[in-house]
Amino acid sequence: RGGSDERFAQVSAFLPVNGTIDLDSIRSFRATLENAFVQNSIFAPEPDAQDPGADTSARLYADAYSGSTQLSVSGKSPGSVTVTAIGVGGDYFLFHPLQLLSGGYVSDEDYMADRVVLDAQTAFNLFGSSDVAGMEVTINGKTFPIAGVVKSEDDFATAAALDAGAKASSDPTGVQSASKAMIYMSYAALNAMAELPIDCYEIVLPDPVSGFAKKLMTEKFPVGEGVIVQNTGRFSLSGLISVIGKFGKRVMTTNGVIYPYWENAARMAESYAALLLILGTLFGLMPAVCLTIVLVKLTVREIKRGYYKAAHAIEDRVEENKRKHYVSGGI
């Protein structure tokens, strides 16, 4: 999204459930990041003063942060529904450009941080329609205007990740306390209801040399026992080979990180892509292997045939010499 002659990379940080990252931590990291850019002589491009239509909004990075929890929401229909609420900040919908069905997104530029975005399932459960931008929902006794309605991703990996998340939140009797229905709202507004740790931080930043962006994040971002993942090049050949090398170990997590649904979906897609790479390689090699086997068999057959011919020829020559010897000797 957007364009530039510079190299950029997208990197995500996933934080453990006992993490202490908050808005102050994000602001502090941004200051540290900008200082690191200066130290490495990385600057945002200056707009052309001679061009009145030049873009003056150029920046070196874009970031987003989020945290999630469960809450009850009520709307026009009687009763309430339990949803997964994601508190978002920064350019969240730049990283997650969900399709809008009505209205618009929420952002840090909003005058009031009290608007929400519903997904289609939540909108249907509460109002029976997705065209509900401008209406209101009630959360903890407070009303929130609806900024817009989005359509959640419908690919197989996301569906599986959402199902897994709902099952993981089931109570001991097996009843799901979580729902695949979702609502998005300002992180500040959601955090004001109950202290909500930030569990995901995402950023696009310069990567002048391959690996620079991830290294900078690893060294400067207070990830603690969390995980840093570079999404750029994730599904490249080298990236999938790396997944194959860690196959099996990927499911063993001991760092206390609960990945958001989009990362679980990405990891699932990675595993499938790696499996397809293995199968594609095997099927690609199979004709060559079969041809090699056939050639080896033909070669061995010809060698054996030549050996038998040579052996018979030698025997015939020996017999011929014996016959000549007997004839010449009068035997």
Question: Over which residues does each language-model region extend?
Answer:
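N-terminal membrane-entry
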Residues: A266-A288
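Short, hydrophobic/proline-enriched secondary-structure or compact coil segments at domain edges
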Residues: F8-V17, D63, I198-P208
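Short amphipathic beta-strand/extended segments in non-transmembrane regions
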Residues: S12, R27-S102
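Juxtamembrane interface at the cytosolic side of transmembrane helices
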Residues: L285-G330
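Mid-to-C-terminal secondary-structure elements
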Residues: G90-L101, L118-L216, K220-R267
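Well-ordered, non-membrane alpha-helical segments in soluble/globular domains
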Residues: I21-D48, A181-I183, S210-V223
